[in-house]
């Protein structure tokens, strides 16, 4: 919910963003079908990069591609370990898209900076 509004706002604000995804090159077709290819500055697919999240190098490479320091990036992800732990480890601010699931008791070394139920909840954070 709110995804299209968020994407439109990012376009209007000329705020660059990227995608980091674990998986194969099939992910490119998914990104294309969703109409994101022209909106996304950087796309990192783990099969092409050679390492999967939470490997810190893939997060640093995305930051370099965006030409934004890790400390100035808000990383949004739905997997506590692969996304939130990985991004947090390189100094990114994190937002966990929880999709109705509780934070795992097994992950105590890191917590997300923000917890959201939908991408639309990012707008107030980005506007601040």
Where are these regions (language model features)?
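Asp-based, Mg2+/Mn2+-dependent phosphohydrolase catalytic module
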Residues: 4, 8-11, 15-128
């Amino acid at each position: 919910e709110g995804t299209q509004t968020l994407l439109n706002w990012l376009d209007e604000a000329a705020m660059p963003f990227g995608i980091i995804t674990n998986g194969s090159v099939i992910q490119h077709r998914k990104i294309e079908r969703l109409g994101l290819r022209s909106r996304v500055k950087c796309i990192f697919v783990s099969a092409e990069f050679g390492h999967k999240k939470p490997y810190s190098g893939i997060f640093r490479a995305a930051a370099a591609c965006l030409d934004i320091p890790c400390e100035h990036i808000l990383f949004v992800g739905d997997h506590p370990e692969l996304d939130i732990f990985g991004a947090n480890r390189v100094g990114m601010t994190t937002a966990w898209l929880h999709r109705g699931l509780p934070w795992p008791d097994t992950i105590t070394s890191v917590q997300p900076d923000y917890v959201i139920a939908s991408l639309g909840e990012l707008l107030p954070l980005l506007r601040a």
